[in-house]
Amino acid sequence: MKKIITFLYLLILAYACYDDKGNYDYREINQISIQNIDSLVLCDQMDLLSIPVTLEGTQYSDSNRFTYMWEVNQKVVATTKDLNVYANFPLGINTARFVVTDKELGTKAFKNFRINVSSSTAGDGILVLSKYQGHAELSFKRLDREGSTFTPNYYEALTGNRLGTNPRKIHRCYIPEAANVNSGLKIETDHRLKCLSEETLVEIGENKYLDHNFFISRAMTLPPDITEFDVKACWHLTTSATTTSLGGYIFVIANDELWHDQRMAMPAYNVDLNMTFMQKASPWHGQLSPVMFLASLTGSGTQNYSSPELLYLFDESEGQFIYANVNSSAANRACSELGIYAGYSLLYGTHTASPNQAVAVLGNGSVYRMLYLKLPSKTSEAAAVPFTVLADVIVPGEVINSGTSYYPMKNESYMFFATDNGLYRYNLRDLENGNAPGSQNRIMTLTDFGYNADDKITCMTVSRTEQEILLGISRYGEDTEGMGEELKGDVLVLDLKTMNMIRKYEGVAGYPVDLMVKYQKFLRDGKENGVDVSDVLYF
């Protein structure tokens, strides 16, 4: 009975406390509801993700009275009311949260949701390799959808890791490997070849680098112990990539030696062969320039190239050209007939539209020479096509120097090259008459497109249809490290024939060192059947 009385007393007391508001100053708290965020948001990786938010408060909803925080995978990605960020998130489902905090009261409102990220990188796109705040970065823009935007500096944001510190080149392999030992993209950085997927633009599993182990695993003989693999240059050459035939080469200059691998496959017949050769040094075992080139690269059928045989290099220690037979283990040989260029390095070399005629650019830091060479492309041609220097001209340093980028036309005698703030178009036939490239060959300057005189073209590429030229432009002045927060690397897309501007992308990268139109499928000239252009690219 005593327990019952005590219980009733406590019940009456609780009711009295609840009903009696006394003399306290009660104030209703502003309650915020968050509108316009779906529970599941769909987006493509690296695309701009925009979520405009509407706030509704029981007393006020003035946006200035709140602070905001967007979290994805427990990481803060924005502190603005509306979300506008590049979707540098892993593929698949990502957990997300939007937090609104009342500045005066400190109360919070939450909205939990998920972001389902799909791949936007599997198709055609532009890749820019740059140096930003002293380290390597990649930027990307898809070309398979109209109105898409650049995703600047996506790599570290997506992976949480640095790409490297000394970026040089982007390389593309079109020959798939079952074990991903030779991924579709190679990023040349820190004297190594970092392997990335051509679809996700990040690493595939544990496949991080292509090094001497790749060649050793495919070779028929084992080399002595190798403690380092110091890469100077790389070149992927695809000769065939059809449904019935796959063929291509990878050439690497590392440790001042040539390493190369040829792969030939016919998937329908379960045929997959390779020839791998390693450690082919100069006859003098000197220092090799980071450049290699062919005497000829001729088309075969509607999509293929004929397989090459002789690859040309330059020994800086001896100042002489040498050649390697890429189809045998034979030692590299000297091209003494081409002369000695003591103190020079080979800055650039290429075959041209004319078979057995190549161009080489040499430099010693103050003098730059352009050579027009007649060279055999096969050992069987050596007697009929002797090693010959057709022309040797001095080129002004303001026209060609160590920072010049080049592109030879596939079927014409013209070469485009970019130096500092100018783009040049030069007829290689002029070399035969001893006429060096000069200011008369300049067809545009950056000032034509609103740039300052100290802005520079730092790299360039041409679409495979040769309809567009893409220029990587630095607005960093003399800063080649891309320091500071502001991105000052641009991409300018021009019509190759008219030089009219197609698009200008500002602030999409750090200091650009290389750019590439990343095609998902190999088409030699962008023509599906060898006749009709099939590329549809939304620059």
Predicted feature descriptions by range:
Residues 180-405, 426:
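Preference for solvent-exposed, low-hydrophobicity sequence contexts
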Residues 13-16:
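C-terminal motif of bacterial Sec signal peptides marking the signal peptidase cleavage site
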Residues 130-216:
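Beta-propeller domains
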Residues 123-125, 182-183, 246-248, 355-357, ...:
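Short coil/turn segments that connect the beta-strands within blades of beta-propeller domains
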